[in-house]
């Protein structure tokens, strides 16, 4: 009895000690999170918690991924988390990733967080070379990635070498050309500078719009065998099922769009596809593992559901999300316009300030020069006045000497000289006196003229001094800065106002705003068509420019296939490729698959 009681107590003690929660680590493309989950939680409980934490509403694109023996698997929504074949060592790790891809990113991805997560995932796939990207397109995509990270190009900030530590191009592309990192940076920056004015979300969307036309974008590949045992690749994506040659993942041999497929099932390793047309025989293939068949079926069901959903009217939830996204986009656009106006006004004010500072410096230099000129004029005037005084005194002295000489001459003439010798001597003295008097008169006249000239120079110097003082006075009294209005001008009446109350944001729309936005969207469509043509021309130009630097011996098999496709004038997009492949009847395509 005592033993039974002790056994029951031990069992209940053990039961109480069992943990009620377990730790889960969620790894997104740019962050890690940890949660405490209840033991009974199903996949949907954990998935919903992650989506709420991220603020993500477009949940149908994403899933929680884990790995089983080198095979990718996804958490099932209706199954307990711990019932999956996952490591029981805590924290249990899952990767939050896009499981399904949109046909048209711009039309289908509504939330900014959704766009951002797709951008990060696709960028990593391209850099890790899981998605093939031609070299010229890699440079363009890199320029949009730089715009998304750094904002508008500013030569004073983004100086040479600012991309040195960034991973922007696949290593395959870098190794394919005889180009230095500086040469790659120069070409990326040239395109980066053209993206001025694009916000982060716009740059990321442009990245996705280009990436979605890459042949391997959004395709999950699986090794299969047909009835004849031929090894092939099955590609599952948003458009349908595609069959590839194992050596060529770029262009499928045949395709089956989702609207032609009625049923998909598997038994053990055998997979069965039933076409919509019941007259057409089913076609089967075998995969390598049962676990792979489960993954293929999951991807087929999810992609098929999304394919059909896109071709129906949007649900109320999606309509609300799109309306909110349009409003948010309009609000951000107006906010960017306001910031652009403020930036322009600030730049104009800075330019005005710089101009005024330059003018002030110039006026200070002019004032300094005027002061120096005034000082020189005053010194010159003093010297001229002193020289004029000396000259005047010398002239007076010479005049006095001339008068004395005249008096001496008159006295000599009046003296009676009785002898011829005395007369001759006297005449000689008279002659000398006359010559001396004449020289004195000429010197006196010259000194008088010099005195007059000095007086004239003195007057001119005083006039220059007066003008210098007048100019200095003008500089001193001139206003340095024009009156500045410290209050920025009010926004135009057609710009809606923003009222922030506590943590909420109120935004009032007017009909004119939505009409203007609609007109802008239509205008953007036309501009996009023109830009696409211009973009293709730029890509071709860059391709031609760097072609001479290509090292042919380093080309991969995919590089060769892409070059051959381009030389043959290959299709411009994946959609065109699939469209051409489905021109034949489904029956003939099934037969072709069986004969591969």
UniProtKB/Swiss-Prot annotation:
InterPro entries hit by this protein: Band_41_domain (IPR019749), ERM (IPR011174), ERM_C_dom (IPR011259), ERM_FERM_C (IPR041789), ERM_helical (IPR046810), Ez/rad/moesin-like (IPR000798), FERM/acyl-CoA-bd_prot_sf (IPR014352), FERM_2 (IPR035963)
Ranges for domain FERM: 22-311
Membrane topology: Peripheral membrane protein
Segments for region (Disordered): 560-580
Localisation: Cell membrane; Cell projection; Cytoplasm, Cytoskeleton; Nucleus
GO cellular component, one term: cleavage furrow
Main location: membrane
Protein's job: Probable regulator of the Hippo/SWH (Sav/Wts/Hpo) signaling pathway, a signaling pathway that plays a pivotal role in tumor suppression by restricting proliferation and promoting apoptosis. Along with WWC1 can synergistically induce the phosphorylation of LATS1 and LATS2 and can probably function in the regulation of the Hippo/SWH (Sav/Wts/Hpo) signaling pathway. May act as a membrane stabilizing protein. May inhibit PI3 kinase by binding to AGAP2 and impairing its stimulating activity.
Subunit structure: Interacts with NHERF1, HGS and AGAP2. Interacts with SGSM3. Interacts (via FERM domain) with MPP1. Interacts with LAYN. Interacts with WWC1. Interacts with the CUL4A-RBX1-DDB1-VprBP/DCAF1 E3 ubiquitin-protein ligase complex. The unphosphorylated form interacts (via FERM domain) with VPRBP/DCAF1. Interacts (via FERM domain) with NOP53; the interaction is direct. Interacts with SCHIP1; the interaction is direct.
Protein name stated in the entry: Merlin
Organism listed in the record: Mus musculus
